[in-house]
From Swiss-Prot:
CDD domains: GST_C_SspA (cd03186), GST_N_SspA (cd03059). This is Stringent starvation protein A homolog. PROSITE patterns: GST_CTER (PS50405), GST_NTER (PS50404). Forms an equimolar complex with the RNA polymerase holoenzyme (RNAP) but not with the core enzyme. Belongs to the GST superfamily. HSP26 family. It comes from the Bacteria. SUPFAM superfamilies: GST C-terminal domain-like, Thioredoxin-like. Residues 92-212 form the GST C-terminal domain. InterPro entries: Glutathione-S-Trfase_C-like (IPR010987), Glutathione-S-Trfase_C_sf (IPR036282), Glutathione_S-Trfase (IPR040079), Glutathione_S-Trfase_N (IPR004045), GST_C (IPR004046), GST_Omega/HSP26 (IPR050983), SspA_C (IPR034342), SspA_N (IPR034341). It holds the Pfam family GST_C. GO terms for cellular component: cytoplasm. Residues 9-87 form the GST N-terminal domain.
Length: 212
């Protein structure tokens, strides 16, 4: 593992451009203003380099000098500690615990449904997107209470929910009805952040507020 890591003089992220977990990490790297190299991974043919670094061959995998990390949450928390400004986790332990629980719930409750929408049949996609839309509309008041997701500052929790909402938009979901304005305002605010724009590359988010 060390020999493969030592070949790299700059922080390197092994990623798949469409993977949601890689997207999370790219947002954090952009928020922190970290210079890094990328290596695109072909899921059909994992490179020997990646297998040497990460025995699971999973992405994202981050190499920082002699350190190799995998699992997006581990990577993001490492980056937040390694580059403390701007902070992406709350200061107090209770708030940190609540944030970690929120991230876990988004990952366990919503990400699998999104995966069904992205990889399933047409009917499975419709059912999955309807479920996601209804569940997010059900918590719409949360989006109106603060600038970001349950916080006045952009946090790691936003790095979980923003890629989900982005993918829903790309799949044609439009929030309408009660609570939709707050959700769309949140999406507009997050999608226009420099870090998010960097994380999606050349894709430009459309103006969500056109669809009131």
């Amino acid at each position: 593992m060390t020999s493969a890591a030592n070949k790299r003089s700059i922080m390197t992220l092994f990623l798949d451009k469409v993977d949601i977990y890689c997207h999370q990490v790219r947002i954090v790297l952009a928020e922190k203003g970290v210079a890094y190299a990328t290596e695109i991974v072909d899921s059909e043919s994992i490179s020997e380099d990646l297998m040497e670094l990460n025995p699971y061959g999973t992405i994202p995998t981050l190499v920082d000098r002699d350190l190799v990390l995998f699992n997006s949450r581990i990577i993001m928390e490492y980056l937040d500690e390694r580059f403390p400004h701007p902070p992406l986790m709350p200061v107090y332990p209770v708030s940190r615990g609540k944030s970690r629980l929120l991230m876990l719930r988004i990952e366990q409750d919503w990400y699998p449904v999104l995966e069904k929408a992205e990889k399933g049949s047409e009917s499975e996609r419709a059912i999955a997107l309807k479920q996601l839309k209804e569940e997010i509309l059900a918590i719409a008041p949360v989006f109106s209470q603060s600038l970001y997701f349950m916080s006045e500052e952009f946090r790691l929790v936003d790095c979980y929910i923003a890629p989900l909402l982005w993918r829903m938009q790309q799949l044609g979901v439009v929030f309408t009805g009660t609570g939709s304005k707050a959700i769309k305002s949140y999406m507009e605010r997050v999608f226009q952040r420099d870090s998010f724009l960097q994380s999606v590359g050349e894709m430009t988010p459309k103006n969500l507020m056109e669809d009131k």
